[in-house]
Amino acid sequence: MSAEKSHLCPLFWQHHEEETVLREELQRMKENGIGGFIVEARPHPDYLEENWWKDLTILLDEAKKLDMEMWIFDDGDYPSGKANGLLVKKYPELTKRYMAVQSIDALGPAKSRSVLIDAWLRPEEELLCVLAGKRIDHKDRFDGDTLIDLSDYVKNGILYWDIPEGEWRIFVIKVTKNGGEEWTKDYLNPCDPEGTRAYLDLIYEEHYRHFKDEFGKTIKGFFTDEPRFGNCQGYDKNIGSDMVLPWSKTLLAELSEYGMGAMKRYLPALWFDCGEKTPDVRYAYMDTVSRRFQKYFVGQLGDWCRAHQVRLIGHVVEENGAHARLGYGSGHYFRSMDGMDTAGIDVVNNIYPGRTEGNFWTAFNNYDTTFNHWGVSKMASSSANLDAKKQGNSICEAFGAYGWSEGLKAMKWITDAMCVRGINHIVPHAFSPAKFPDPDCPPHFYARGQNPQFRAFHQWSAYTNRVCDRISGGKHIAPAAVLYHAEAEWGGKYRPFEEVVKLLMQNQIDCEVVWSDILTDREKSSMKDGMLQINSESFRVLVVPYAEYLPHGLTERLRELAEEGLPVIFLKDYPKRSYFGSEFIPRDGMLRCDEETLIPLLESLNIKDIIPLEKKEHLAYYHYRKGSIDRYFFVNEGLTDTISVQIRFHDNREACFYDPMSGELLKAEQRVFLSGEEEGREVKLLLRPYESIFVVFGENTEACVENRKMKETIGWNILGLPESGWSMESSSYDTYPAFKAVEEHTLCDLSAPDKMPDFSGTIRYRLHFDGAEAREAVLSLGEVYETAIVWLNGQKVGEAICPPYRFYLPEGSFLPGENEIVVEVINTLEKAHHENPFDRYWVQEPTGLLGPIEILWK
């Protein structure tokens, strides 16, 4: 296995399996480059009871033997927050509470009218206030200046009121435990500290009581999964939607601190358009509840962990922009990450190979690729790189709930999509020791030995560890900062940060996502030599996605930065005004442009870190510096076109390549270039679909070997192997390594209805052919579905988990006279096991070796 430190820590599901099964699963993980695991009840029949502690003791013992890290999933089910049902049983008063509104429409003038108020209150609900406002144009719009508090006119549950002239609406606002997300109704109130304290006592303290001697040693910490407000179901629950709202006992007092006096009378603006003050009220509310989530939920969990010598990792719900909203969201991604020791996300069913534009359906949602492909990973790595306490560490829970159609090929592509945006630790979802096939969100990687591709899993894990190791422990280099949009979204029209990130990355301009809190903290952000400094990073420009409104402190900070020499670029237009503030007036150093002119503007500012000599929108890169070594990770994100391009680097040292698939340093074709007074290197890059490479400056280039990966074979001799005449054998996933003959001798799709449509496992192909005298030769298998292992004349040539299925043939392996080639092709389990809701969302691929197969030689 690779010598790099393991950056893989999968979820390991527990259902109270036999001891031998648990130990075997851990052994298979360790053998395949996995250095840790997260124990998750999924579900465990005796969670927090005797058999749970027994199973954890077994896992802890085996982890110590294997020198593996152990993490503990912090609840009996996901999302985190119910303490396996104990919270509502022991502390029902600490479960979630909401603020709800009921509406009664009234016409005036009308004297001596009364309205039943208590009739709107269910048992255990509390009346907060009764307000009224005048309607505009017979619609659900209200004149904010007419909002009035009528609470003092409520006597014995009845409102007595002389209704003024016009159309009015009476708002009955109450505190309730009803109306939120049904799934999480018994979870702790994330806005109050008492619920989290009880949760810690029930889960964290109980694990500490049993295993405190291993805390900070083998047990490294807790994983918290998708904590949320849960005031309703959905990803798109912006403030202003028809829903109950998160509530805490001190909420009204905190809202009043925003400079609007008795904020209570403006509460209808949280649901309805109440004129000019609506953006301010909504911002104040979201700012308050997201800070309470930050401090009293995730922050309190993290503080407990660090006080007990362990760490807190995990993630919230990010998909489709939920990270900045209520519902499934936590209000503000960067605030929810503040208490964690790593910045986390998940990529579960929401990034697919080649899907980089538009929307697509999955078993969970209609996913937005602009966020899920371009934005989510960059959001996490930015938190990791800019929040000093995270020390550059980000994690992604990945690969789960795709169905068995997802094999190592898709995993490699998804890994590249995450890592080229800075993710450097991966939580594979999942290892399940349950009886095969476990229907719970496949794929499962070992699957009690039934996953045929696990034979090649070590290829993916070694590759991933090499990539992650080379983007860890140093610092990211990016020329641009892009403002996070949550505060803009809360109150007005806006554009999300990921649209800017996408535009920049398609033009090879890397960036970090920066957020208001870190920008306005002058101890964490400053100007030096005309550049914005945050943590160890320096930015030459700040891009602000369109925002109708921004917080006053942020707009003041943007003015300061511009005045100190930082180009601050506003897309589309400047803000209309700040929240609770006056009209926004731009300063010198502030620029305005549209999307079409952003890239030319940035190029005119001479900020680019690398300069491709041709436009290649599918070429993604990530620059990472560790000590004196600079590494540029390049990925071809296209599925069909080879990228061949010259790239200029602002570094005059000799460059080389590092191939993370083979672990080799390779020679690079390059030349020195002069541009004005600058001397740099121009390096030729060739990447086929699914390929990646590091361009490295500062390595000992004497250790480089011949670069066979990028060798051009134009003009070489071509020997095409025939489509027919092959002998074939098959070994099903559940009978391997026993093979039997296949009644087929021609390369074709073996999943055709008249052949082997339900087959999952290994197909062995064998052919004898005449060779030639060759100094060099390259074998190309053409189309393969999907993992290939190749032998030539009894010598193993290599294995490949994804395209391009090209193998360099060592001198002497391709001979004149008779040669024998053997190819084993392993498909995924979806042909035999697609009885789940996930595989039906994939367009199924063929099975087997399709070719054309060629040997290129000279």
Tell what function each PLM region has:
Residues 6-24, 35-40, 47-80, 84-85, ...:
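Carbohydrate-binding surfaces of carbohydrate-active enzymes
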Residues 40-152, 156, 162, 172-197, ...:
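Acidic/aromatic-lined carbohydrate-recognition and catalytic surfaces
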Residues 178-180, 701-703, 826-833:
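Short acidic/polar inter-strand loop motif in beta-rich domains
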Residues 647, 769-793, 800, 821-824:
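Aromatic-lined ligand-binding clefts that engage carbohydrates, nucleic acids, or primary amines
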Residues 692-698, 777, 815-827:
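Short, well-structured beta-strand segments enriched in hydrophobic/aromatic residues
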Residues 803, 809-812, 817:
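Glycine-centered tight-turn motifs at strand-turn-strand junctions
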Residues 833-858:
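Exposed low-complexity, polar/acidic, P/S/T/G-rich flexible segments that act as propeptides
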